[in-house]
């Protein structure tokens, strides 16, 4: 049986090679070998996804490559989700996070990864999906009273809608009851500061760490 480092390296390769079948196989192998699922995701699948993201940013890869890598990661995570859920039931809930891709944006790659990582970290995640209307974010905040509401935007044209979340939460009188987080390829710390968001998640790992810090948990 392969050692932990070898399994993690294979997990990373399955993403950079856009291989769904390999990702699922590696996940099975990792579970059988007793590899920590969180470590497998962080150092294997997510590391591979971040490498693909960097190459996409440099113009070496294109959107279909990123989507294929995301599908591979999804295949791997699906295999280890039951084990994660089993562990999660034995730990306390750190809080509720509502997450969705902003109105007008049909891409869900980054959002899906952040949602998975937050779930694994011990948060209850309510995933609203993609192309989510601003009013839906606001309605869900009022209904579910989460600790964090997060929006992802993968295009500069949809990024501006993140301002609307801030404004409509204020209009609804609930802005001070929830932390807001923004992320996505064109989003920056400067943008988060400009619109008044509480948290900027640069990557999935960064998002989890910052949510924990903001809520003083974990």
Swiss-Prot record:
CC per GO annotation: cytosol
Pathway, per record: One-carbon metabolism; methanogenesis from trimethylamine
Molecular function per GO: cobalamin binding; cobalt ion binding; methionine synthase activity
List residues of the B12-binding N-terminal domain: 1-92
Q: Which UniProt keywords apply?
A: Cobalt, Metal-binding, Methanogenesis, Repeat
**This protein's superkingdom?**
Archaea
User: Gene3D superfamilies, per this entry?
Assistant: Cobalamin-binding domain, Methionine synthase domain
Q: Where does methylcob(III)alamin bind?
A: 107
Query: Does the record bear Metal-binding in its keywords?
Result: yes
Q: Which residues form the B12-binding domain?
A: 94-218
A GO biological-process term: methanogenesis
Q: Which Pfam families match?
A: B12-binding, B12-binding_2
- InterPro entries according to UniProt: Cbl-bd_cap (IPR003759), Cobalamin-bd (IPR006158), Cobalamin-bd_sf (IPR036724), Corrinoid_p (IPR012741), Met_Synthase/Corrinoid (IPR050554), Meth_synthase_dom (IPR036594)
Write out the function statement from the record.
Acts probably as a methyl group carrier between MttB and either MtbA or MtaA.
| Assembly, per entry | Can form a complex with MttB.
Family affiliation: Belongs to the methylamine corrinoid protein family.
In Swiss-Prot or TrEMBL terms, this protein is called Trimethylamine corrinoid protein 2
Native organism: Methanosarcina mazei (strain ATCC BAA-159 / DSM 3647 / Goe1 / Go1 / JCM 11833 / OCM 88)
The opening ranks of the lineage are: Archaea, Methanobacteriati, Methanobacteriota, Stenosarchaea group, Methanomicrobia
């Amino acid at each position: 049986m392969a050692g932990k480092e070898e399994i993690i390296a294979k997990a990373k390769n399955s993403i950079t090679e856009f291989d769904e079948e390999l990702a699922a196989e590696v996940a099975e192998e990792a579970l059988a070998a007793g590899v920590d699922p969180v470590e497998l995701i962080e150092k294997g699948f997510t590391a591979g996804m971040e490498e693909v993201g960097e190459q996409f940013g440099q113009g070496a890869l294109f959107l279909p490559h990123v989507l294929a890598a995301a599908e591979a990661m999804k295949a791997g995570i699906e295999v280890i989700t039951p084990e994660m859920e089993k562990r999660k039931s034995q730990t306390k809930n750190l809080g509720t996070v509502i997450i969705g891709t902003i109105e007008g944006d049909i891409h869900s790659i980054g959002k899906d990864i952040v949602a998975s990582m937050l779930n694994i970290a011990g948060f209850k995640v309510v995933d609203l999906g993609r192309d989510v209307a601003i009013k839906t974010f606001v309605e869900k905040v009022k209904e579910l009273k989460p600790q964090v509401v997060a929006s992802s935007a993968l295009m500069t044209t949809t990024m501006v809608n993140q301002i609307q979340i801030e404004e409509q939460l204020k209009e609804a009188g609930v802005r001070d009851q929830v932390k807001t987080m923004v992320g996505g390829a064109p989003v920056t710390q400067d943008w988060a500061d400009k619109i008044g968001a509480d948290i900027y998640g640069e990557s999935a790992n960064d998002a989890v760490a910052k949510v924990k810090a903001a809520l003083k948990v974990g």
